[in-house]
């Protein structure tokens, strides 16, 4: 029999990145805590497919995360710590921190993104996905660790952002391609009250089968003379099932040309 052909590195990555499915009912992850209500509704009611034909930005980020796990070492560091906590209305909030630095009392999350998304996220205010993700980790750490031991950790939350299209000669780019940002942390009771209100509203929408209103900020941008919902077209995996976005709503832009 002929020797079986070994898969190429690219083929292995294609297998690693495939995802298709619907999120577990009544569960929200830390990275979703600041997401628009419509996006959460679609995640609970529709299938999201990261299909076999192309790599998504999330795929590249996942692969890079695996590399960071192997690169950073230290006895005072914990990697990929999964936590979860229940709200009083039965919704589960989960979070997996990329890195916890016990020596410096910091929870670190890696972000791999283009400069445009990096800048836009920091313009979104106190309820931005990044701020709410940090608030979620703080809230989770104040409950229990993975072994069930109450910790009440008062740790800072830092974002380590890797600007994938960084250019030192462009004025709107940061000085370096890797940026570490200390994020403000919500009061834990305030975070919990916000998430209770959000999940109650979400559950009502699900039960009534009524999609929430369109997302407030879809990052409108004119690209090659065409007005594009940037956030929908390039950063939302539910765009093909969103009632406010059609597959032909805007032409695809040449992302490589963006600054």
Spans of features found by a protein language model:
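Metal-dependent nuclease catalytic cores that hydrolyze phosphodiester bonds in DNA/RNA
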Residues: 1-107, 114-122, 128, 142, ...
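Long, highly charged amphipathic alpha-helices
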Residues: 63-70, 136, 193-197, 201
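Metal-dependent nuclease catalytic cores in nucleic-acid-processing enzymes
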Residues: 66-73, 123-161
């Amino acid at each position: 029999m002929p020797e079986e052909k070994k898969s190429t590195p690219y083929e292995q990555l294609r297998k690693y990145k495939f995802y298709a499915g619907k999120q577990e009912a009544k569960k929200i992850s830390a990275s979703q805590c600041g997401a628009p209500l419509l996006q959460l509704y679609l995640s609970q009611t529709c299938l999201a497919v990261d299909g076999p034909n192309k790599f998504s930005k999330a795929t590249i980020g996942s692969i890079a995360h695996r590399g960071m796990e192997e690169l950073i070492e230290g006895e005072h560091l914990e990697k990929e710590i999964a936590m979860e906590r229940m709200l009083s209305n039965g919704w589960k909030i989960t979070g997996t921190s990329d890195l916890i630095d016990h020596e410096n009392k910091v929870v670190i999350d890696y972000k791999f993104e283009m400069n445009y998304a990096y800048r836009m996220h920091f313009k979104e205010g106190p309820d931005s996905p990044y701020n709410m993700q940090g608030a979620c980790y703080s809230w989770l750490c104040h409950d229990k660790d993975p072994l069930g031991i109450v910790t009440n950790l008062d740790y800072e939350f830092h974002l380590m952002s890797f600007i994938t299209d960084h250019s030192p000669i462009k004025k709107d780019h940061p000085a370096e391609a890797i940026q570490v940002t200390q994020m403000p942390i919500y009061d834990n009771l305030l975070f919990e009250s916000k998430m209770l209100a959000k999940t109650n509203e979400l559950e009502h929408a699900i039960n009534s089968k009524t999609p929430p209103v369109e997302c407030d900020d879809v990052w409108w941008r004119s690209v090659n003379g065409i007005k594009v919902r940037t956030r929908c077209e390039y950063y939302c995996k539910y765009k093909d099932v969103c009632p406010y976005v059609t597959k032909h709503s805007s032409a695809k832009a040449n992302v490589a040309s963006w600054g």
